[in-house]
Amino acid sequence: FEVSELALYTIDMEIRDLLRRQKIEIIPVLGSITDGGLLTRVMAQHKVQVVLHAAAYKHVPLVEKNPIVGMSNNVLGTHTLALAAATAGVERFILISSDKAVRPQNIMGASKRMAELVVQDLASRSAGKTVFTMVRFGNVMGSSGSVIPLFQDQIAKGGPVTLTHREVTRFFMTIPEAATLVLVAVSFACGWDGIVLDESPPIP
């Protein structure tokens, strides 16, 4: 399920290539998490058991410049998706959140914290039919929007390298660690709780 046609096409081709010898049906759906009717129909039609909610605007400067759209997608979209999951009887709903939701310092972080509260509220009223939980990611090395590709590009162009502060410290997780965190949440979540990776030592 993806709102970007190019992103959906790309990931569909990648997954089909990886699973070309497996008899697994892949159904790409083009749509927005703000479309509650479509979400409910798709989940019910395909008997979806697990929802991994990673559809968020996460680039801090862009969300700062587009706060209404950022809040609409990250907060209202989360509410629409979580409600559709509960309505369709999905077994598990995993919200992919951010460490920026802790004492948020920007609009993106605030939107992720509000998304957590929205899902927590639905969890308290779901009567156990749908298990809601969340995982908080830090900086994922190599992911879209990660600072590492940005730094590499800036260095390749001869600098300067932009830092938020001279004394800044960043914690990183690898893509396999991030994937494992999500799988742990799917496997062991039994109610509203949060799962956070004990990340590697900070990189000063």
Where are the language model's segments positioned?
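NAD(P)-dependent short-chain dehydrogenase/reductase
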Residues: 83-86, 107, 113-195, 200
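Hydrophobic/aromatic anchor residues within beta-strands of the central parallel beta-sheet
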Residues: 28, 70, 132-135
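Conserved Rossmann-fold NAD(P)-dependent oxidoreductase catalytic core, especially the SDR/UDP-sugar
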Residues: 53, 57-60, 64-117, 121-122
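Conserved Rossmann-fold cofactor-binding substructure of NAD(P)-dependent oxidoreductases
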Residues: 22, 27-50
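Conserved SAM-binding loop
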Residues: 11-12
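Conserved residues in the N-terminal Rossmann fold of short-chain dehydrogenase/reductase
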Residues: 29-30, 72, 165
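Short helix-capping segments at alpha-helix termini
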Residues: 18-23, 89, 125-128
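Helix N-cap at the beta1-alpha1 junction of Rossmann-like dinucleotide-binding domains, i.e.
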Residues: 4-7
